[in-house]
Amino acid sequence: MSQVNFIVVIPARFDSKRLHGKALLNINGKSLIEHVYSAALKSDAKETLIATDNNQIQEVTENFGAKTIMTKRTHASGTDRINEVAELECWEEDQIIVNLQGDSPLMPAANINQVAKLLSDSPDTGIATLATKILDPKELEDPNVVKVEFNESGLAISFNRKVKSKSNQMYWRHLGIYAYRVGTLKSFSQHERSEEEVAARLEQLRAFDLNMEIVIQEASLVPGPEVDTEADLNVVIAIMANN
């Protein structure tokens, strides 16, 4: 099986609304962003970069050896930030980029490789991403857990923070990881954000505005939690202390 040619970019902001300065929060002796970077290095990516608009983050990430690209402060989303990186690095239009969220320190390398291959195997699809089954009913009520619906072909139908009406159907949690080609990034970033995207704080809704298909697979491994809140941080600290 031929290996997919892909690059990982980790967008990292300091001014997170839900957990201020979380990229630099200490988790068992290392910053959150260093743990995410280490997770990415375990994948088959040919290169891993960090994209930030913060000098403090840049200093920390360069000190642990990460190639770090300084970007504008005005970007509306991590995808928009990564598009600037693609322009600065002059990547080819068909280069596959994996956007690994800067709050995902427990993302398995297998999932990073999986989402890149999913896009590579879907030449007519704009974006690829992953999901896991929601087994804890509390997650249905948690707005930090993004719910995704997709059809039998694996194409996304909707993304929501709230479940509008509960039923016995299987609910899926959207994971903070995307793969797209540089050409898709450009189209995405040139399009204005809709009121719905802004209100929901879900950048992937812009793809629907552009009629881009988003293909989804169940993640090969269930990752640990993303760090959105103080409670998440404490859970991740405990998990990493035991590993």
Predicted regions and their residues:
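Conserved core of the sugar-phosphate nucleotidyltransferase
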Residues: M107-E196
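Short, structured coil segments at secondary-structure junctions
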Residues: D44, F64-G65, L210
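Short, acidic/turn-prone active-site loops that include or flank metal/cofactor-
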Residues: F14, K72-G78, L221-P223
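Short, high-confidence coil segments that cap the C-terminus of an alpha-helix
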Residues: A45, E92-D94, S122-T125, M212
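Short phosphate-binding loop-to-helix
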Residues: L49, N55-K117
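Conserved alpha/beta core of the MobA/IspD/sugar-nucleotide pyrophosphorylase nucleotidyltransferase superfamily
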Residues: Y171-N243
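N-terminal glycine-rich phosphate-binding loop and ensuing alpha1 helix
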Residues: Q3-T52
